[in-house]
């Protein structure tokens, strides 16, 4: 890729912030990062950083203020439920220096959902509170909405709800050039392929080339993943990689994308 072509590549970045003591304690495994990163990649948004932080207001405030200034988009998961330790909405309001109160539309949606006023308890009403100036993010599954404050999108923590919230708002995102990928699987160990792989990376500096070892049928198997925005460059690098592996008497299989 020429310098002129590289300069025309539009890169849009994102950070994912997972909020929850239950993740840090090991009690719950996060499933949202992989989903969001995959979906964002399809839209041409590159996840450049992920953080896992506790339900501590000062930490949430500091983290949000840092990452919203560094990335085009920020996505948070967790901490907008009905219990006392669900403090994400209040913390984001503080990060933006605004107040927080019940959103009329959120209250209306939840009132319709629960039907019986006795079921719409004070605890559940907490989930209708959003920072002043926020735009609601629809929740097709359990109604209680997420919200958007400028470039920060706040979702619940339950994976099924995260997925539904993301699908409901992804049209708001403006992505860059889609990130494409190709994968070559080889039987050569990383220690053998490392030097030529490094040389290939130097020749194709516009691509990201990674090596991921594992076992397949009880034998060493290494997946070599090439990622970039220029398909022609990806094809050239992939073909060169396969040729190099064959010259080293190794097996090379390009996997279907």
Where are the model-predicted features located?
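Basic/polar N-terminal segments that are highly enriched at the extreme N-terminus
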Residues: 1-9, 257
């Amino acid at each position: 890729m020429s310098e002129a072509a590289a300069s025309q590549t539009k890169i849009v970045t994102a950070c994912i912030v997972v909020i929850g003591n239950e993740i840090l304690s090991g009690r719950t495994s996060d499933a949202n990062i992989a989903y969001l990163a995959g979906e964002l990649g399809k839209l041409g948004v590159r996840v450049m950083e992920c953080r896992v932080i506790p339900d501590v207001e000062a930490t949430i405030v500091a983290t949000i203020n840092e990452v919203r200034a560094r990335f085009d988009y920020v996505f948070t998961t967790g901490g907008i439920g009905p219990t006392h330790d669900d403090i994400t909405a209040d913390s984001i309001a503080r990060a933006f220096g605004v107040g927080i109160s019940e959103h009329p539309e959120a209250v209306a949606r939840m009132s319709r959902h629960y039907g019986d006023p006795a079921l719409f308890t004070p605890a559940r009403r907490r989930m209708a509170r959003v920072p002043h100036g926020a735009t609601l993010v629809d929740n097709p599954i359990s109604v209680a909405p997420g919200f958007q404050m400028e470039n920060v999108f706040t979702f619940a923590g339950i994976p099924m709800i995260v997925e539904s919230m993301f699908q409901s708002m992804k049209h708001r995102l403006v992505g860059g050039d889609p990130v494409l990928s190709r994968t070559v699987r080889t039987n050569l160990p990383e220690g053998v392929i490392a030097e030529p792989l490094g040389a290939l990376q130097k020749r194709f500096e516009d691509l990201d080339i990674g090596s991921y070892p594992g076992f397949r049928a009880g034998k060493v198997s290494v997946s070599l993943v090439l990622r970039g925005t220029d398909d022609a460059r990806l094809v050239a690098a992939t073909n060169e990689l396969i040729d190099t592996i064959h010259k080293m008497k190794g097996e090379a299989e390009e996997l279907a994308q």
